[in-house]
């Protein structure tokens, strides 16, 4: 558990909890269980919960990441409940019993009521691609092929480019259950936005991620040079080394010819 305030004499305050890990023994989450955990960003738990109460995440306004560890082959309803409670963009990392992982982004959506004055009634509208992504469950169990199949449809909707980048990157990087057909669709998007993807990974100082991205994309000389310059300015030696090695591999400098007279 991570809190904003720690040390001798510090008083417990659920409003200061930033990251919370639940034990494997938890089987029931009651009504309003995390009420007013206003600083909570990440919830780590096991997929063993069999009952979810009402409004468990009320006023958890910063919570945007669920890390879910499977206990066995049976998938339960935790992910369905989590994404159903959040209309904002959220991320879920699902780790299977064999250690393989899928990291999914569920985009934001909004439910809007507009007053139709002449008819004295309200009209209900849904905006944003996130709503359809919350329908990729069958009997409250995640269907990964359905999630991946939405990608091309998503690109035809109104969406945030940064969100699309996170979706494509995380699904390709943590790719449990990902077919090659769908992997290529995500890969194509990253090839079209390689500069932005490199910038994102530089900001995160993710050396392993950057190395993986370079195996999946085809950055040109100018992209690599710009990224290397940024890594140099950041003082990020590991990232710079990865980029310089990639430059040398893709665009080797010809050896100088010498002659003995």
Q: Can you name each region flagged by the protein language model?
A:
Residues 212-214, 243:
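Conserved hydrophobic site in ankyrin repeats
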Residues 201-205, 232-235:
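Hydrophobic/aromatic side-chain positions at a characteristic register within alpha-helices
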Residues 1-5, 13-28, 38-51, 61-81, ...:
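Structural signature of tandem-repeat unit edges
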Residues 229-261:
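Charge-dense, extended regions
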Residues 177-185, 220, 243:
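Non-catalytic accessory regions outside enzyme or core folds
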